[in-house]
Amino acid sequence: MLISKSKMFKTFWILTSIVLLASATVDISKLQEFEEYQKFTNESLLWAPYRSNCYFGMRPRYVHESPLIMGIMWFNSLSQDGLHSLRHFATPQDKLQKYGWEVYDPRIGGKEVFIDEKNNLNLTVYFVKSKNGENWSVRVQGEPLDPKRPSTASVVLYFSQNGGEIDGKSSLAMIGHDGPNDMKFFGYSKELGEYHLTVKDNFGHYFKNPEYETMEVAPGSDCSKTSHLSLQIPDKEVWKARDVFQSLVSDSIRDILEKEETKQRPADLIPSVLTIRNLYNFNPGNFHYIQKTFDLTKKDGFQFDITYNKLGTTQSISTREQVTELITWSLNEINARFDKQFSFGEGPDSIESVEVKRRFALETLSNLLGGIGYFYGNQLIDRETEFDESQFTEIKLLNAKEEGPFELFTSVPSRGFFPRGFYWDEGFHLLQIMEYDFDLAFEILASWFEMIEDDSGWIAREIILGNEARSKVPQEFQVQNPNIANPPTLLLAFSEMLSRAIENIGDFNSDSYHQVMFNSRTAKFMTNNLEANPGLLTEYAKKIYPKLLKHYNWFRKSQTGLIDEYEEILEDEGIWDKIHKNEVYRWVGRTFTHCLPSGMDDYPRAQPPDVAELNVDALAWVGVMTRSMKQIAHVLKLTQDEQRYAQIEQEVVENLDLLHWSENDNCYCDISIDPEDDEIREFVCHEGYVSVLPFALKLIPKNSPKLEKVVALMSDPEKIFSDYGLLSLSRQDDYFGKDENYWRGPIWMNINYLCLDAMRYYYPEVILDVAGEASNAKKLYQSLKINLSNNIYKVWEEQGYCYENYSPIDGHGTGAEHFTGWTALVVNILGRF
């Protein structure tokens, strides 16, 4: 096989093969077609910039024993403090004017652009692959932002062939020069095999002063040519490439200054002083730095290619012209695939043109896809700390132990702020990704489901694997605990996937759907094979169902509420016997001011907190999980399970109305026991996202009169409707805009998206172009869709980025910058709704 795949995929595909061989209706050729699909998936997704936290960092997917790790860094070495502006990890502190993908598809490649005013650099990185996915090339191209400003672009590449030495020799070694500044390496990986790695200049002017006989200030410190240093760095420390580089160059500077204390060096020799050299006479090792320093007073800039070719490959990339051709083909192919999935017709909005709208959507989707990463390592878990639910104080997780290693293939909310997997976010990411590449969304979903613990059914709310991922997380959030949940959005996404497959085939339980198989001849032009061929999804559902059942049961058990506290109250109200006692829930782990498990951290809850508090959103998410499990059981023909889930779903829906609907407030609310009178059920009503969640998750019956009341709330400009989207909390609420102000007014795309989607479900006429006066729902749908998408576009046009959330006052971007996680759902709104 090409790679050592994870246990998950080995098991899945072996199971599929057994099922096919056992079926009388499927011949060997069909089995071969399944194997071709597997091969296509593994090859097309093997290589990509899967180090989400880096501006550009490569590693292969599901290769963890001996991966080749690669990264790009840069700085202005003409500045004495240039090392402080060395770019490596994506971080808001760098204050780049722009960074991100303009066009990107992990199966194909793309174009990433960096505008770095401090370093006077307009840097473009192209990433392309051979058609079979085995080989790749990275083209690094830079131009000065201001050629009149004296500066350099000192670009630092690093490569590490992890996995140790082979027969006492380095597993990645330089084997020659094809030119004065071109280098060739031979590498070997236990999983990838043998390969060549080349670095070749196309054009550019290395920094030098023609008046000087030499630019060398110490042996090896010469900025007028490519500098190379090889050394041994432990695999677990490779992610510290920036720190190691800064340390080695700083030591070199001190050595130079100590040896020539009285000599005053000209300013244009500073780039040589800031060039890496082998000061300590390291023996060659698995790790390599390559530093190229270009003169940015030359308008034409510079360009060089980094190329990886597997030995024995049939599709090697060997010339500059081939790289150029692959770049052209890749960008054209991605654009064609994008246009096939999304349509941007003229509409009654203020976006200037279809092409501008399309460019915004393509860039936004590209940055969501560009955040996809492969993570491998240990996770910190505290299984000892006990939760005292009566205190409602922040619980310190001080008994963490490393567990693992684990692996996760996932997208991330933000490369600069949150470059790791978030359970709450990922389901929303998949709702967008599946519209472009259904099979890719499935690969991510399957990786997450593999994180379900076999014994307990728990999934951590954040997956933080290894030191590189952990370095970007505040210490107080690094440790996970099995008592804490998060909204189960992954099942929301899986339910949508199954719905798509059912729609495409018709009767999912008929025998005919098994006959629709993968077509190997068209695979390389299709990324929705699983959507069109539900047999694969069914076999996967069979494999994963026991784990999903454990996860479902874990969530219900861990978040169960205390209904007995309400017995006398509800008996007095005459509804105790109608209540379904097993379907009441609250979020475990809330404090006086925050409820992190709910995902809506500071959204106002009952004050003071009480152990008897019941949360309407926790119940609603159980409804979503149950509906998804019912659908899976239907697909698998598990009739008794399906009936049981249908019963639980009905009980959830009834409890939403019986327990959480306030007739006085006309909305869904949390409930608690009145702190001043323990014989009264208190409706804790804070109109906002929690109030509309049963609607957004399609849990209200279609014939319910409550639908119109929820629509009225969403339409009210005095409450949560605005020119920029639905506010997270009503303007009239006492907590609006107060304190941290995270979910107390700011506009979030994920809930807005669910509300728009729910309106399409409850009111099909909202998308129909029919004459006559529009209904309240249609007016809301049309105005919300336009307001939301126009504001996100406007902020992107002005600032260059999507944001985590948006101001309820004037719509400007707030929270994390360059947040193309669930905010990227704007692409669906523009191109699909």
Curated annotation (Swiss-Prot):
Chief location: endoplasmic reticulum
One cellular component (GO) term of this entry: fungal-type vacuole
GO molecular function: Glc3Man9GlcNAc2 oligosaccharide glucosidase activity
PTM statement from Swiss-Prot or TrEMBL: N-glycosylated.
Membrane spanning residue stretches: 11-28
Superkingdom of origin organism: Eukaryota
Binding site for substrate: N42, N122, E143
Function text: Cleaves the distal alpha 1,2-linked glucose residue from the Glc(3)Man(9)GlcNAc(2) oligosaccharide precursor highly specifically. Seems to play a role in beta-1,6-glucan synthesis.
Protein name: Mannosyl-oligosaccharide glucosidase
